[in-house]
Regions:
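Non-catalytic C-terminal accessory region of glycerolipid acyltransferases
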Residues: 9, 46-175
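Catalytic core of membrane glycerolipid acyltransferases/transacylases, capturing the structured
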Residues: 1-45, 69-79, 83
Length: 175
């Protein structure tokens, strides 16, 4: 959310996965899209994806958070810090359709300055390739590169390794 907020002064389009609680959705939606922003932020379930694709054919920026584990569907397993991670491949499909650039962005807390800093890397080159697995690995390695700037401040609370390759143990304690 902090990276999206820091980029919201620019004309960007973004989507988010709604929470189960309507009140939380209201607060989060309000904080993600203030009246002074140029950002347009939509809940995934109420915004047709074709609108994103049409918007990307114009000079627009689509802020897409790809470091989520949404299960087996639309994912490919690739290494992420030496663990097989279910990596979203939707960004690959978006690039194939729109020919847009993919620019890795990550927001990290800088313990020295006590501020959040948005790191923007150079666009991925040769993306997409002929291999979904290679593309998933490229996406993950771009995240690794940015996370390595300040590893301890990355949002490790996300359950990245929730979806496991078949016959691989679940890494978290079952509560």
């Amino acid at each position: 959310d902090f990276a999206g907020r820091s980029l919201s002064k620019y004309p960007i389009i973004s989507m988010y996965k709604p929470f189960r609680n309507d009140l939380i959705n209201w607060f989060v939606g309000r904080s993600r899209s203030k009246k002074t922003d140029n950002a347009s932020v939509f809940p995934r379930d109420n915004f047709p994806f074709k609108n994103v694709l049409q918007a990307l054919k114009k000079p627009n920026v689509f802020f897409y958070v790809g470091d989520e584990d949404l299960g087996y569907e639309n994912s490919e397993f690739a290494d992420f810090f030496f663990q097989q991670q279910s990596t979203l491949v939707a960004i690959r499909k978006i690039v194939e359709i729109t020919n847009c650039s993919v620019v890795p962005v990550l927001n990290l807390f800088d313990s020295k300055s006590s501020k959040y800093i948005t790191y923007i890397d150079k666009p991925l080159s040769d993306f997409p390739s002929d291999s979904i697995t290679c593309d998933a690995r490229l996406i993950n390695s771009s995240f690794e590169k940015l996370i390595n700037i300040e590893k301890t401040e990355y949002m490790w609370s996300l359950r990245f390794f929730q979806t496991r390759p078949r016959n691989v143990d679940y890494p978290y304690k079952k509560l």
